[in-house]
């Protein structure tokens, strides 16, 4: 990355931070996010990636805030509600992408609070211990430089026994919109087959990178025909009976997920989830 791009990214980051600080502070002053009335309804799927050791306390605070302000359900239950277009109180389900090692600790924190999540993983990197292979995979496929460990099969089994769900995130985290149909089927179908052979049922899929430009709308039906009950993006939104899904009609069979990051100030994540309900009521 050039110095100019680095500076531009830093400037955009600070502008985003300042805008969110202003919005979340103003909303707090107005008391908008201190509880929802009966006009607020809908399901939101939360998307996380990593919980660093120094972020564990903040993650637990976030979980406590969720339980106080939303009905928190399993990922599968949330998908059922979305598909049935059932009108429900503000409801949230939690998911993680990529299968980083620290997801094990996140699952333990969730279990301690009686909650579960769906962890979307890529079989080709599960259990890998070679630093060079991890570095190469992370840089080429995840576009990250600081990853050192991924979950192994034993840990995934442990998480599933604890009540969490394991989802399909393709075999190797390729950008699916760059692939031919046969490669796409290998990435998605191959991953599901391997996950099922190791862990049993795999009901949900999420595509890497998460934006609509990273997937092909005509492949949504293929994902479902392979046996998945849902096909998830990383596009923000709330699912309610009054609103269409996916913002783009071509993706109306997909489910939206709202990215939050424990590296952000907690109030920013709270603002996103609260604002979704207020604009969606």
Question: What is the role of each PLM region?
Answer:
Residues 98-105, 109:
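Short acidic, Gly/Ser-rich segments with clustered Asp/Glu that frequently serve as metal-coordination loops
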Residues 61-69, 109-114, 162:
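A short, Lys/Arg-enriched amphipathic alpha-helix followed by its capping loop at the start of a domain
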């Amino acid at each position: 990355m050039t110095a100019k791009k680095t500076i531009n990214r830093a400037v955009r980051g600070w502008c985003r931070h300042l805008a969110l600080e202003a919005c979340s502070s103003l909303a707090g002053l107005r008391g908008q996010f201190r509880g929802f009335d009966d006009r607020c309804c809908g399901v939101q799927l939360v998307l996380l990636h990593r919980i660093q050791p120094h972020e564990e306390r903040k993650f637990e605070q976030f979980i406590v805030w969720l339980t106080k302000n939303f009905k928190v359900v399993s990922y599968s239950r949330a998908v059922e509600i979305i598909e049935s277009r059932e009108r429900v109180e503000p409801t949230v389900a939690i998911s993680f992408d990529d299968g980083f090692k620290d997801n094990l600790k996140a699952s333990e924190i969730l279990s301690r609070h009686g909650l579960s999540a769906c962890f979307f993983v890529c079989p080709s990197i599960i259990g890998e211990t070679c630093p060079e292979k991890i570095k190469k995979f992370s840089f080429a496929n995840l576009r990250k430089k600081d990853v050192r460990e991924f979950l192994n099969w034993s840990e995934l089994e442990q998480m599933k026994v604890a009540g969490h769900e394991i989802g399909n995130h393709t075999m190797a985290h390729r950008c699916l919109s760059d692939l031919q149909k046969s490669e796409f089927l290998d990435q998605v179908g191959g991953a599901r087959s391997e996950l099922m052979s190791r862990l049993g049922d795999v009901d949900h899929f999420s595509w890497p990178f998460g934006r609509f430009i990273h997937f092909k709308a005509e492949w949504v039906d293929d994902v479902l025909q392979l046996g998945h009950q849902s096909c998830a993006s990383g596009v923000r939104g709330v699912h309610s009976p009054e609103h269409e899904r996916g913002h783009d009609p071509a993706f109306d069979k997909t489910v939206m997920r709202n990215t939050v990051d424990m590296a952000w100030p907690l109030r920013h994540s709270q603002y996103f989830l609260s604002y979704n309900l207020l604009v969606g009521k």
